[in-house]
From Swiss-Prot:
Source organism per UniProt: Paracoccus denitrificans (strain Pd 1222)
Phosphoprotein recorded as keyword: no
Protein name according to UniProt: Trans-3-hydroxy-L-proline dehydratase
Protein family membership: Belongs to the proline racemase family.
GO molecular function, one term: trans-L-3-hydroxyproline dehydratase activity
Keyword field: Lyase
Amino acid sequence: MRTSRVVHVVSCHAEGEVGDVIVGGVAPPPGETVWDQSRWIARDETLRNFVLNEPRGGVFRHVNLLVPPKDPRAQMGWIIMEPADTPPMSGSNAICVATVLLDTGIIPMQEPITRMVLEPPGGLIEVEAECRGGKAERIRVRNVPSFADRLDARIEVEGLGTITVDTAYGGDSFVLVDAASVGMRIAPDQARDLAEMGVRITRAANEQLGFRHPANDWSHISFCQFTDPLSERDGVLYGRNAVAIRPGKIDRSPTGTGCSARMAVLHARGRMKPGDRFVGRSIIDTEFHCSIADEVELNGKRAIRPIISGRAWVIGTKQLMVDPDDPFQNGYRLSDTWPMDL
């Protein structure tokens, strides 16, 4: 076969959300920190387009690039590439990356528990993997500091009028809205409508509220998280959510950074404290088991350290290639599957 490059990928999903992992064929990008490297990837776009655009990718796909860690405490660094963003952190992608590292032997597995430190762009995370029979069966992530930003803010949204929302950060930035308050249900047959409405709400929140992280230059709201009311059983809170990811899709997983952001809001409202547990349930009924590890301060801002726990499965391996004569070496996007006007 004729090809000008070969990129080695292990395909994976965490509780339904695709998080492929590049394990070879791509050199680490320039940058003194993993954050700097992620900004280079975001600006350059060459790799993003190659792996995310059709015919190799699609709006449903996230791709993670393994890089050598910059912090000596970490065993591996990685950069997350999502359809619209190159974010600081992702819970489902962290679970995919940890699973791939262990299941493929890149990092040696220790049964029954393997502990490691990983370095996404947003800061170090501690990982504990339950392992059995050569498989990482469940990944527990101690996430980056997470915080509520605005509570009960009011914004104007086209087609909805004035709505009340919260904004928060859980490794990425969210606007949170009660699904019923905007006439929506969190159900598979509502996914298209949730995605389209969520992108509109995200745009309005960015225009009218904005966001700025106190310790890095992340300065926009990435996602809209629709929530259903909480229930409680045996002291554990349960809550369904659906996160609309730009340019217009719904996360299949419960969204680890979204669960972290929701717990930060619940903590700010006095509904959760360190040690309390929360189970986030996705639109396809998969779950992340979460809790608040402790309270921290982030450049003067009150924050929490969330814990996210979930499962991932390796579903394949592949080699991405490009023929020198291929007219679509950087891929393409069409609005039938990649919304462009939301």
